[in-house]
Amino acid sequence: MKNIAIIGASGYTGAQLTALVHAESELSIQGLYVSENSLDKGRALADLYPVYSHIDLALSPLTEEAKAKIVAEADAVVLATEHSVSLHLAAWFYNQGLAVFDLSGAYRFSDVAQYPKWYGFEHEYPEVLAKAVYGLAEWNAKEVAATKMIAVPGCYPTASLTALKPLKNLLTSAYPVINAVSGVTGAGRKAQLHTSFCEVSLTPYGVLGHRHQPEIATQLGQEVIFTPHLGNFKRGILATITVQLKPGTTTADVAAAYSVYDQAPLVTVKQNQFPKVDDVVLTPNCHLGWKFDENSGYLVVASAIDNLMKGAASQALQCIKIHFNL
């Protein structure tokens, strides 16, 4: 039995992860934590999320005493916190010997020079950053098993990279074009007018400047054009990607490339049949659908995931189970 501490448990991702860990027979929850100044401290998780009424746990403030208790009792800590908060907490818990699974972007880039531009802070822990592994579960399982500092990928990068990485050896120098739509839970639980359900209308945002663009490009090893969109639905991501493949590539070559997922139980691939968000919501699955035009050399692949599950909480759980060989 491995004990897991979850910090940032009051948010959508933290609460979803709590439910997933609670359902695992080989995992237990050491505690649920929020910041000391959170208005949710002391409240039961079920008060915030009645759907989790079967989970009889309260949200504790992350005091110095609580941190010491986590170190003494937990095998791993999951951070569902702001980037600037995870930056410090991840390094502290890692240096105490715990396995850290960080759902923020604070450890996703190996290059410290990326952080001021994309996250607005200087990275203060290059020695910990050097140990971090990008937790794209289907691709980096060996690395996740071997390190105690796991940076869980972003939601858009998970959808995009799952679709693109099998094609790496077939791509030309032309930038893949990624258009992705996410439900409003991707913006978090904090009340904001522009993410209020009655205000949301399908619209692009972060055009040519979203921080997930360099994350995707870094992990793919090739620049991309990435345009996210906010959709008027609660949860889920659909990424539709257009790529140019090398001259002479055949449909059989594409099928062979995607056969890498034949033994991946959470990834489903279909040719000439495209996924729907509703089919992956509340699941840890990724559904891919593709079609290739041999005459033009262009391929369109669509990727559907639940942004709170495969795009966050369930991928963190995948990494936890890989790391502890569960």
From Swiss-Prot:
Output a single Gene Ontology CC term carried by this record: cytoplasm
Keyword Transcription (UniProt): no
Location of this chain's protein in the cell: Cytoplasm
Role according to the record: Catalyzes the NADPH-dependent reduction of N-acetyl-5-glutamyl phosphate to yield N-acetyl-L-glutamate 5-semialdehyde.
Annotated catalytic residues: C155
| One BP term from GO | L-arginine biosynthetic process
Top-level taxonomic group: Bacteria
InterPro entries registered for this protein in UniProt: AGPR_AS (IPR023013), AGPR_type-1 (IPR000706), NAD(P)-bd_dom_sf (IPR036291), NAGSA_dehydrogenase (IPR050085), Semialdehyde_DH_NAD-bd (IPR000534)
Among Pfam families, the record links this protein to:
Semialdhyde_dh, Semialdhyde_dhC_1
Q: Which reaction does it catalyse?
A: N-acetyl-L-glutamate 5-semialdehyde + phosphate + NADP(+) = N-acetyl-L-glutamyl 5-phosphate + NADPH + H(+)
For this UniProt entry, which residues form the secretion signal? none
The family line of this record is:
Belongs to the NAGSA dehydrogenase family. Type 1 subfamily.
**What does the record give as the organism's lineage?**
Bacteria, Pseudomonadati, Pseudomonadota, Gammaproteobacteria, Alteromonadales
Pathway(s) served? Amino-acid biosynthesis; L-arginine biosynthesis; N(2)-acetyl-L-ornithine from L-glutamate: step 3/4
Q: Where is it chiefly localized?
A: cytoplasm
The EC number(s) attached to this protein equal 1.2.1.38
Keywords assigned: Amino-acid biosynthesis, Arginine biosynthesis, Cytoplasm, NADP, Oxidoreductase
Q: What is this protein called?
A: N-acetyl-gamma-glutamyl-phosphate reductase
